[in-house]
Design a protein with these regions (language model features):
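Short amphipathic alpha-helix with an adjacent loop that forms part of the alpha/beta core around
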Residues: 44-48
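Short beta->alpha junction loops/turns
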Residues: 10, 38, 63-64
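Non-catalytic, surface beta->alpha helical segment in thiol-disulfide oxidoreductase systems
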Residues: 59-83
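Local sequence-structure signature of Cys/Sec-based thiol-disulfide redox active-site neighborhoods
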Residues: 1-26
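Compositionally biased, disordered extreme N-termini, encompassing classical targeting presequences
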Residues: 1-2, 29, 82-83
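Structural micro-motif
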Residues: 49-58
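Thiol-based oxidoreductase modules, predominantly thioredoxin-like and allied folds used
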Residues: 30-42
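Non-catalytic interaction surface on structured domains
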Residues: 18-21, 28-31, 59, 71
Length: 83
């Protein structure tokens, strides 16, 4: 399972989302990839998805949420994405 979190430097919501997703991903012994929208990989992804806001989470390349999820919501998204 590939989990990516699009963030922006200095974004307080992104820091909060990162904490939530780090916890949820660690429980699954998976890895979280952070993509800053100011870097080429992050820019390319935001353009491809036509995103105007961060944080945003992708699981296996599919946009699953924008904004800050609760830990319970993050766990649920991970459970739904298992396959």
């Amino acid at each position: 399972m590939k989990i990516e979190l699009l963030i922006a430097e200095g974004c307080p919501f992104c820091r909060e989302a990162e904490q939530v997703w780090r916890t949820a991903v660690a429980e699954r012994q998976a890895e979280l990839r952070l993509l800053d929208v100011s870097h080429p990989d992050g820019q390319a992804l935001t353009q491809r998805l036509t995103l105007n806001t961060v944080p945003a989470v992708l699981i296996d390349g599919i946009l699953k949420g924008v904004g800050v999820q609760t830990l319970a919501d993050a766990r649920q998204l991970l459970n739904q994405s298992r396959g």
